[in-house]
């Protein structure tokens, strides 16, 4: 009997000093123990409760399925410990995390979700998910646990079937912050790691920001995903990149709120099949360097077509507001809002299969005739062809009226840097401080300028002796005064029908 009693005492003694506890519980006071979850556990932390752990993984649900966490208090790695992963959900499945309080890492990775499948995180108004260093939320290969070609990193129940193709679903109404890489969903060179099936929704009052570095959202190679920043939502970078989705495919980015960065606010270089919509404000603040506030597929390839729709404001303190140079797979830009830069509003150099429909305002406030223009159809190469099936339909205003700036620049000031096969249909106003339209290269071919309706040119059209067709459309509805210079090889097509 004494031996049995001693065994019971020792059992409870060692149980009481264990640093791991079951996750199927409610924490209503301060706890310093790690919680290790099992499948289908439900963890509740009340507003009076806290989990403050002095090592990595304050709450550990690696490889578990169906875990639900609701935090109204605090889940954190202890201040001053430099420990990571307040919540460790690697390779988990069907996880739900609802935060009404604070989730914080004293180092990196507030919530760690590498290889997780079908994980929903809701960060409500007044709540915070943060990391004192980088990555408030980190999830490499989310929704793609078998990307390496095997199922080794998938949750155990997926060991035979592999990935569900459903990644992170994030609903943010509160604050998500880190020094940099605030939400990290893939950085891998060569395509590994990468995530898919991601849905990020940042609602009115929600903020996703980096406090001292780049990338509030970094998701290289992201695929089959969408990011929506709603009216009243903010994505804010202290450095470069607001949303970095380089090498992504089949992505929807919809901004109805505010996205700001130092430069390259939306960066989707070498992307395929991007649908980008802006009805809010997107801006970059760097006054000395910027390759594009919105840069989509600046790569010489024929990837799936992109659609860019702007009814809000896209502006750049320096460099192109929209940069689509070198895209040949097909891009459509529909603008009913404002696109503005101190240098070049839209950079469309070396493009093919491009259509720009402007019903709004495209403006450069620059003053020189080399890099300051409303739209630039340029060519920075002497060996690569530029232009083919490129159409500009202008019903609004395209202007660069300061100094020697040009409304539209075509080709480059170099003998072999020409831009060909471009049609401009102008029913609106094109204005330049020097030229409304300038053929910067005398070798440009296959060019046509069609004047329609109320089409107006403020500033001469400089043809530079190119073989350009000037077409006067039957729809012209007012008297025209078009000043054309160096028109030696100009061809005029007169389709006027009673208005001449």
Language-model features and meaning:
Residues 1-4:
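Positively charged n-region of N-terminal signal peptides that target proteins for export
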Residues 36-41, 60-67, 79-80, 86-96, ...:
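Right-handed parallel beta-helix/beta-solenoid
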């Amino acid at each position: 009997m004494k031996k049995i009693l001693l065994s019971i005492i020792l059992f409870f003694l060692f149980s009481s000093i264990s640093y791991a506890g079951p996750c199927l519980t409610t924490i209503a006071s301060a706890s310093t123990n790690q919680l290790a979850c099992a499948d289908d556990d439900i963890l509740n932390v009340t507003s009076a409760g806290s989990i403050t752990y002095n090592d990595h993984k304050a709450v550990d649900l690696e490889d578990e399925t169906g875990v639900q966490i609701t935090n109204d208090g605090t889940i954190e790695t202890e201040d001053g410990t430099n420990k990571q992963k307040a919540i460790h959900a690697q390779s988990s499945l069907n996880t739900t995390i609802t935060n009404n309080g604070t989730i914080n890492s004293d180092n990196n990775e507030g919530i760690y979700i590498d290889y997780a499948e079908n994980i929903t995180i809701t960060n409500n108004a007044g709540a915070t998910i943060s990391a004192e260093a980088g990555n408030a939320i980190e999830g490499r290969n989310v929704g793609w646990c078998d990307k390496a070609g095997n199922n080794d990193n998938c949750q155990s129940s997926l060991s035979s079937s592999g990935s569900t193709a459903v990644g992170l679903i994030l609903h943010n109404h509160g604050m998500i912050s880190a020094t940099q890489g605030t939400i990290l969903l893939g950085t891998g060179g060569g395509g590994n790691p990468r995530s898919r099936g991601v849905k990020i929704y940042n609602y009115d009052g929600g903020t996703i920001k980096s406090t001292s570095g780049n990338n509030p959202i970094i998701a290289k190679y992201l695929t089959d995903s969408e990011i929506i920043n709603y009216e009243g939502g903010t994505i804010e970078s202290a450095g470069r990149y607001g949303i970095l989705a380089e090498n992504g495919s089949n992505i929807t980015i919809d901004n109805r709120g505010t996205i700001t960065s130092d430069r390259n606010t939306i960066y989707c270089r070498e992307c395929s099949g991007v649908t980008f919509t802006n009805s809010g404000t997107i801006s970059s603040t760097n006054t000395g360097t910027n390759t594009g506030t919105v840069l989509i597929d600046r790569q010489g390839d024929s990837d799936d077509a992109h659609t860019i729709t702007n009814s809000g404001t896209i502006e750049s303190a320096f460099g192109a507001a929209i940069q689509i140079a070198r895209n040949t797979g097909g891009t459509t830009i529909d603008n009913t809002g404002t696109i503005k830069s101190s240098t070049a509003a839209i950079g469309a150099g070396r493009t093919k299969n491009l259509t720009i429909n402007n019903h709004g305002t495209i403006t450069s406030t620059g003053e020189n005739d080399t890099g300051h223009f409303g739209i630039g159809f340029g060519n920075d190469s002497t060996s690569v062809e530029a232009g083919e099936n490129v159409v500009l339909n202008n019903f609004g205003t395209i202007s660069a009226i300061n100094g020697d700036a040009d409304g539209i620049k075509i080709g480059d000031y170099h003998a072999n840097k020409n831009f060909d096969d471009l049609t401009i249909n102008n029913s609106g106003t094109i204005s330049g401080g020097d030229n409304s339209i300038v053929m910067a290269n005398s070798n440009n071919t296959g060019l046509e300028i069609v004047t329609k309706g109320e089409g107006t040119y403020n500033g001469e059209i400089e043809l530079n002796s190119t073989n350009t067709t000037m077409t006067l459309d039957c729809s012209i509805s007012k008297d025209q005064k078009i000043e054309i210079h160096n028109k030696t090889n100009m061809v005029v097509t007169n389709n006027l029908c009673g208005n001449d």
